Amino acid sequence: KNHLDYIKKVHSSGNSGIYGVSAKNKSDLVETKMAELRQRHRKAMTSGSTQERKRAAVEKKLLTSYSKWRGTRYVLGGDSRKGIDCSALTRRVYREVFNKELPRVSTQQVKQGTRVSAKNLRSGDIVFFKPGNRTNHTAVYVGNTLFINASSSKGVVMSSLKSPYWRKYFRYGVRVHNV
C-alpha cells in the first residue's frame, strides 16, 4: 500500500491515527506542524526526490510507533505500555523503527552518535533537553520540529521544538543512524 493512500485512509476514517493528538494534549502549534508534515508527505510521495521519499518513509515508521505509545502514562523507570519514561520510550521507538538497540538511560544514549544542532536535525535523531542542572530528558525527532515525547505530566505526546518550553531547554540532537 503506498504512503499517500495510507495517510488518506487514516484521516478519512475519522480516527486521528498516527498524526493525531489526543484531545487533552491538543495544541495549535502541534496541530499546525502535523498538518504541515502531512502536506510535506503528500508532496514527497507524489513528486519528491529519492531522499525525500526515504525521509517520508522514516517519518511514517516513527509516527506508527508513536501511535502505539500515544497516551501511555509517564512512570520514572517504566519500560512498558503500563508506564514509560523518556529514555525507555526512545529505546523502544528505536527498536521498533530502526531495529537498533540503544542503552536504557539517557546518559548512555547521548554517547551513541554524532551531535547535531537543531537546524540540522533529521527524522530519527535523538533530541536531548536540559530542564534541570544536567542534560537528562530525551525524545525522538520526527520532523518539522515535532518529536515523540514522554512527558512527565501528560504521558506520551507529540511535542514541538517551537514551543517556548522545549525551545528553552533544547541542548542538541544526536544522530545514531544514516537516513
How would you name each of these model-derived features?
Residues 72-123:
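Catalytic cysteine-centered active-site loop
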Residues 60, 64-68, 88-96, 122, ...:
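Solvent-exposed, polar/charged alpha-helical surfaces in well-ordered, non-transmembrane soluble domains
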Residues 1-72, 176-179:
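Intrinsically disordered, low-complexity
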Residues 138-139:
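A conserved glycine-rich beta-strand in the N-terminal activation segment of trypsin-fold
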Residues 124-125, 145:
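Structural motif
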Residues 1-16, 142-179:
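Aromatic- and glycine-rich peptidoglycan recognition patches
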